[in-house]
Amino acid sequence: MMPQTTPPPAGLCVQDLTVRYGTAAVLQGVSFSVPVPGQLIGLLGVNGSGKTTLLKAAAGLLPHTGQCLLDGVTLESLSTRRLAQTVSYIPQQSGISVSLSAREVVLMGFNPRLGVLQSPTAAMRAAADEALRTVGLADKAGQDYLTLSGGEKQLCILARTIAEDAPLLLLDEPDSALDLANRSRMTALLAQLVHTGGKTALVCLHDPALALDSCDILVVLQGGGVAAVLHPRTDPPAVLQAALAAVYGPLELLPVTDCRGRRRLALLPL
């Protein structure tokens, strides 16, 4: 009889992740797992709790100990090219400072699949235009990226992420430059991308109310460690309230029904 092998764990697993700047540990032994793909994971915590550091470490941009696994594959073991095909990282600032059209920015998402000096194919160009249409920027495809508004730039970078088609998305406050309407659009697009595409997204969010409303799972950081892992759809409001209040200070969560009949939680600081 052949020995049975244990299948690799599905989803995202962060194991004992530690990041140091000099002698100071910014993250210390961070561990959590989300064993089901297709989840939008909100990363919460006050300024300085290590949210951005965690994203950068998972993206392979910071030296660290511990490891991150996606569907059983250790990200730290991947080549630079393979890691770029597996992980799509979106920082708070795009870093783009040269004149490129919005379409050209989206086409950058295909770079990990192209050889040296290889140009995007016609199919890639069509996919880039479709991604821009999805985020509502079809009419901006030929416009210089640098002339777009802050919110349009964020949506353009999201279109690049759609084109990239990586299984793991790491996004650092993608809503930071968006108005109320576009924040809702951004989170709805992210949820659709994750849920229909079977992807896993770890999203750093500044606003716990937005995270409660849009995320499937919340990982709350405090002092460089994991304070709580929460499930907004199933955890009792009292559990969510206590965990968030321990990090953000006094607050109250009130179950409400919106005008469309959806049950939601309103967050009120006290």
Q: Can you say where each PLM-predicted feature lies in the sequence?
A:
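The feature captures the beta-strand-to-loop junction immediately N-terminal to the Walker
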Residues: 44-46
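Helix-to-loop junction immediately C-terminal to a conserved catalytic motif
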Residues: 59
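Conserved ABC transporter NBD signature motif
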Residues: 66-74, 83
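Conserved ABC ATPase "signature" region
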Residues: 107, 122-140
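Conserved ABC ATPase signature
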Residues: 144-148, 152
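Catalytic Walker B motif of ABC-type/P-loop ATPase nucleotide-binding domains
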Residues: 169-173
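ABC ATPase nucleotide-binding domains
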Residues: 237-270
